[in-house]
């Protein structure tokens, strides 16, 4: 089963083979992404081990959403020992997010 994931916007998009699912996970992405994926696998009579490859929409987009999504797909691909592809179809060893602007991180206090 091919898995596609896009966490670049507040609405998460998950593809499983030819089916597409959307969920407004937004600020709850980190807490609920694994369960969202697992629930959809179960709906399709599948399990984690049935995933044969992963494609990830690596950006541009939300800093936090891309960071969380990239961490999840990188971990899944590594654990399941399956191929990982960026949104352009390139097989990659690791997803590196493409942010739409520099991260707004405050300077450290002196």
Which residue stretches match the model-derived regions?
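Oxyanion-binding and handling regions
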Residues: 1-49, 78-110
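DPxDG-like acidic metal-binding loop motif
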Residues: 53-58, 63-82
């Amino acid at each position: 089963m091919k898995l596609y994931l896009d966490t670049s916007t507040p609405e998460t998009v998950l593809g499983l083979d030819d089916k597409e699912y959307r969920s407004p996970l937004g600020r709850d992405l980190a807490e609920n992404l694994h369960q969202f994926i697992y629930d959809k696998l179960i709906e399709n009579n599948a399990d984690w081990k049935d995933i044969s490859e992963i494609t990830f929409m690596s950006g541009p987009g939300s800093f936090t959403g891309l960071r969380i999504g990239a961490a999840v797909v990188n971990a899944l691909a590594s654990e399941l020992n399956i191929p990982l592809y960026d949104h352009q179809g390139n097989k990659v060893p690791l997803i590196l997010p493409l942010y739409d602007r520099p991260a707004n991180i405050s300077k450290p206090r002196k």
